[in-house]
Design a protein with these regions (language model features):
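Acidic, contiguous N-terminal accessory segments
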Residues: 2-28, 37-249, 400, 441-448, ...
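Conserved, mostly hydrophobic/aromatic
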Residues: 103, 209, 256, 277, ...
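Flexible, acidic glycine-rich loops studded with aromatic residues
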Residues: 125, 451-456, 461-621
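Feature activates predominantly on carbohydrate-active enzymes
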Residues: 189-377, 389, 397-400, 404-407
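Hydrophobic faces of well-ordered beta-strands that scaffold small-molecule active sites
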Residues: 254-258, 285-287, 341-345, 408-410, ...
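Active-site beta-loop-alpha junctions enriched in small/polar residues
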Residues: 261, 290-294, 344-350, 413-415, ...
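Active-site neighborhood of glycoside hydrolase catalytic domains
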Residues: 359-360, 364-457, 461-472, 476-477
């Protein structure tokens, strides 16, 4: 159970009593909170620190969200984001969670069950004990890691499908539940798929792996009424719509990037972002750890990287960095939520902070002044000096040793002052140094001309799908993560009056974030070469976790759906309705979000306890 409603979702997290290390330079969160719905101004008034157009949007959104939750609308089986692959509703099979419910699990499923119980206990007030048994009982939630295929009957694809009659299948249901009917095909759930069955007697989540169980548990969370996000007990009927969902991801890599180099974000903020990713079945968090303005990860063999390079940020703001234990904590927290951390050490450019700390790495061997602006392309490590490669080997070696995931991101973008031949030679050596650690090289698509190393992944952030160099790299064996700047860059403004963000790649409203196909975006790149999608958030103008959330929501779930859901489920009109229904959940959970006028936000009525927003509302940079 959460004891701090504004804290990340912890559940029974492994005990860690260490205080935040003063050397981490973590910036204490602001104690100011976002305006409550009750304190919002009347039309024509403004919010402190927010320009009038943005204040009006905030007022409208808060007025809509002020209480859409007291009499929550019924949730339909397909009202889930990302859209499930196959849905077979059974209106006669609705289940109601009650105070005597028990989560019955096999031992391998206990951790997922404990997390699920932790999500549900505050709002329901139910004890929801977890029992190590798969023997069912009345009003029981059952999770099993076994991938049990059942005969396929009526198959329904897409979230708007309606059920058909099918043959009964005996056995395996919670005692007191109606027999499960054959429905969508659950063969081949893979590493992350799951099957969720809801009957009048209980809920069963079936998967082949804990990750699949976790994704199924997140789906169940969305199938409960929106007040389930409340930090205090709410007297509503905790109904779950009946039927069957069979679901698996379209792409294996689904992620978001948080730039902690331009502005530093304390560990607790990063953990909160992990929770947001996990909620929408994103499974990778890319941390942009180094840039001109700051170096954010401790490297024992090069201590001045953080002691000196970690002291600055954009706009002369306070710097900060993660100690090794800080980083381990982030990695472990993410892993428990089936999110893999992808660390980025940006090379050879974007290195001013490193050069301030170690001028021998600079081409002129003179320390540049610290940089707190937002220009790019002026800094680089000396590709002709052997000390540079000793530095790279030490840094990637230490970061790789702290990172259990398979990836290490080398950056590689915007090294404008490095001659092309020197750039290719540097990247070739740096890639081999990463490969020597056992990690798979990831880099921005500017790495494309360099020699290929086995497994190499390019992250494509262009705005024009015609990219012959990237297509050639794919022909040589590279795979792609799609992050098109004009669709997936979440630091772009929603509209001209958005109070924070950029517009160099255009404005990205929710529809633009949703309406593109990763499998067909770069010409000459076949669908099978696309590993997945990632939504980057650069933070030159983003300074608090509330501002991070404002830029993530509601666009992050749009990119998440592109990565998870089958192409045939993609439909803007249906998506916007499903996405708008998330608004009351975000309000109750204390998540700051942009009240996009594109979405039909539900009508609201007051009355549900909400979690406080973590810091402040967005302000102009």
């Amino acid at each position: 159970m959460q004891t701090n409603p504004a804290a990340p979702e912890t559940g029974p997290e492994p005990t860690d009593t260490r205080p935040t290390s003063p050397s981490s330079g973590a910036v204490p969160p602001s104690t100011a909170s976002a305006p409550s719905a009750a304190s919002l101004p009347t039309p024509g008034e403004g919010l402190p620190g927010v320009p009038a157009p943005a204040a009006e949007l905030a007022r409208v959104a808060a007025g809509r969200a002020a209480g859409a939750l007291a009499g929550p609308a019924a949730v339909r089986l397909g009202d889930v984001v990302p859209a499930p692959g196959q849905v077979l509703p059974d209106p006669a099979g609705d289940f109601t969670l009650s105070a005597d419910a028990v989560l019955r699990v096999s031992p391998a499923a206990r951790d997922v069950a404990e997390q699920l119980a932790g999500w549900l206990r505050p709002a329901t007030g139910f004890p929801l004990p977890v029992a190590d048994t798969t023997e069912g009982g009345p009003l029981t939630l059952t999770l099993s890691p076994a991938d049990t295929a059942v005969p396929s009957g009526a198959v329904a694809s897409g979230p708007a499908s309606t059920g058909r009659e099918a043959a009964d299948v005996a056995g395996g249901e919670p005692s007191g539940a109606t027999a499960r009917t054959a429905g969508p095909d659950d063969a081949g759930l893979g590493d992350e798929g799951y099957r969720l069955d809801v009957t009048v007697g209980g809920v069963r989540i079936t998967a082949g792996t804990p990750a699949g169980l976790f994704h199924g548990a997140q789906t169940l969370r969305q199938l409960l009424p929106a007040p389930i996000e409340s930090p205090a007990p709410v007297a509503v009927r905790w109904a779950v719509p009946g039927g069957t969902i069979v679901d698996r991801p379209r792409f294996p890599y689904r992620g978001a990037m948080l730039d902690v180099a331009r502005h530093f974000f304390p560990v607790e903020d990063v953990l909160r972002v992990v929770d947001h990713l996990a909620r929408y079945k994103l499974n990778h968090l890319h941390l942009h750890l180094t840039d001109d303005q700051g170096w954010r990860i401790a490297v024992d063999s090069w201590p001045r990287l953080t002691e000196v390079g970690g002291a600055t940020a954009v706009g002369d703001g306070p710097g900060g960095w993660y100690t090794r234990d800080d980083y381990r904590r982030i990695v472990a927290y993410a892993a428990r939520r089936h999110v893999t951390v992808v660390p980025e050490i940006d090379l050879p450019g974007h290195t001013n902070a490193a050069l301030v700390a170690y001028p021998e790495l600079a081409p002129g061997k003179v320390a540049p002044p610290p940089y707190t602006g937002t220009e790019v392309g002026f800094s680089f490590v000396d590709p002709a000096d052997e000390r540079t490669y000793a530095f790279v080997a030490d840094v990637v070696g230490e970061v790789a040793a702290l990172t259990p995931g398979p990836w290490l991101h080398l950056g590689g973008d915007e090294a404008f002052k490095v001659p092309a031949d020197s750039y290719r030679a540097f990247v070739a050596r740096a890639q081999r140094l990463v490969a020597a650690t056992g990690k798979t090289v990831v880099g921005w698509h500017q790495l494309a001309p360099a020699e290929h190393v086995d497994g190499r992944v390019l992250q494509w952030w262009g705005t024009n799908g015609d990219d012959p160099e990237t297509a050639d790299a794919v022909r040589r064996g590279a795979r792609l993560i799609l992050s098109p700047g004009n669709h997936a860059y979440l630091d772009m403004k929603y509209a001209p009056d958005t109070p924070i963000g950029h517009d160099w790649a255009g404005l990205i409203d929710v529809r633009r974030a949703y309406e593109w196909d990763p499998a067909r975006h770069v010409r000459g790149v076949p669908a099978e070469a696309v590993l997945g999608v990632e939504a980057p958030l650069w933070t030159e103008s983003v300074t608090t976790i509330a501002e991070v959330e404002f830029m993530l929501f509601p666009r992050l779930p749009a990119v998440a759906e592109l990565g998870w859901s089958p192409r045939e489920t993609h439909d803007w009109s249906r998506f916007r309705s499903r996405l708008a229904a998330q608004g009351p959940r975000w309000t109750t959970a204390g998540i700051t979000f942009h009240p996009s006028p594109e979405l039909p936000w539900p009508p609201t009525t007051p009355g549900i306890p909400t979690q406080p927003t973590p810091h402040t509302t967005p302000t102009t940079p």
